[in-house]
Amino acid sequence: QKRGLIYKYFKIALSNLSSKKNFYITKRRDSSSLKKTIDNSSIYLQDVYIDKSISINVEELSKFKDLIMKMPEPRALKIDVQGGEFDLLKGSEGILKKFKYIFIEISFFNIYLETGSCENIFKILCNEGFKEIFSYNKLIRRDKLISKDYLFEKDI
């Protein structure tokens, strides 16, 4: 517990299927992902290129339902998975309704391969009963909106 927040760390990645996958570690460590970077990613983000890869266990968020249900309400979920947001949400349908708030980074210009569109991310959240209430932290490079963080609230 830190600053009144309760959290746990797990050495796994979240996506839409339970499996074992490559996790691509980029030179800029906070940009590492289950997704490979596009060839010219460094044009937009200088140190976002693959340095090495490791094999990692991948699970669906729903696998943590019991742990989620033990969390005090209102529950909040922070999603920042470097291009894997759509896949994570696809593997979370049904469990998302247990959260009141979702903080999510959404990319508009993909620097990762095989990502879902921002429109589909918004569609899943809308279908799960969430509405956008705030956006912040725009990342702009070379006059392109790369990503932005959003806060969604469960529409009761």
Positions of predicted regions on the chain:
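Phosphate/nucleotide-binding beta-alpha loop and adjacent structural elements of enzyme active sites
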Residues: Q1-I156
